[in-house]
Curated annotation (Swiss-Prot):
Gene3D superfamilies: Pseudouridine synthase (3.30.2350.10), PUA domain (2.30.130.10). This is tRNA pseudouridine synthase B. Its EC number is 5.4.99.25. One of its GO terms (molecular function) is RNA binding. The active site is at D47. Belongs to the pseudouridine synthase TruB family. Type 1 subfamily. It catalyses: uridine(55) in tRNA = pseudouridine(55) in tRNA. GO terms for biological process: mRNA pseudouridine synthesis; tRNA pseudouridine synthesis. Responsible for synthesis of pseudouridine from uracil-55 in the psi GC loop of transfer RNAs. It is an enzyme of class 5 (isomerase). Keywords: Isomerase, tRNA processing. The gene is truB. HAMAP family: TruB_bact (MF_01080).
Amino acid sequence: MAKRRGGRNVTGVLLFDKPAGVTSNKALQQVKRLFGARKAGHTGSLDPLATGLLPICFGDATKVSGFLLDADKRYVVTCKLGVATDTGDAEGTERDRAEVPALDEEAVERGLTGFRGPIDQLPPMYSAIKHQGQRLYDLARQGVEVEREPRRVEIYDLQLVAVRGDELELSVHCSKGTYIRTLAEDIAQALGTVGHVCALRRLGLGPYQDPAMWTEEMLAARAEQGREALDATLLPMDSALQQYTGVELADDLAYFVVQGQPVFVPKAPSEGWLRLYDRGGNFLGMGQALDDGRIGPKRLVARR
């Protein structure tokens, strides 16, 4: 008989403020233990050096976490010029040095122009991408470097916040799959030097833009007030899906959807993902518009 997973049933999304020096998985496990939750998952890793928004999905909300993995992100990043590291950030070992040319805001702005819109990035060796079944970062730690194919990403917005000596502070709004470390290195090269990320903070992800976040200390204080106070920090799972159109279903249609059957909904959108609700406003899950005009249920949540 399979061993029953311990913990309690908790459902919702926590907007966690990850501290520096902690891996995303370690942060997840710490928060999961604090909630005593049976099931939880994060929505895409932040580098250990990075701080900021790490949405953690509990219970049924893990079924919609993939939509956040595909979402756009916003960061504030500080790039240290003149020194390159093997990891592309301050946690790595120095691998190169170069003089930093005299830079003012106008010169930096000229350098940034080529990094707005669609760009191709070469994934760093210190990344979770797999090569013949092995993570690139595992190969990198063995001193092995392999060829990587460039990947197309999009920089929706890139702004210079400040120039402070040999450091640049930038705000970045980018598509999924963008490596900020690679972006910082490429910008440094465009400015005639080398560089690495020395500070990185994620401020937004998908529908969550500049949200209130919870630190581990804040959560611990809530936990001392009891489970009800702790659970009040969670957002409903459909908060992660506000970029998609919501559709209210009549009672008979909601019944069929819950059974996993496609339904025809008059005047519903004819393409894309859709949030599905019953007449009581209860979130049923995600559906997808089908070619025949019906809505097919794809990610249903448990009925209680």
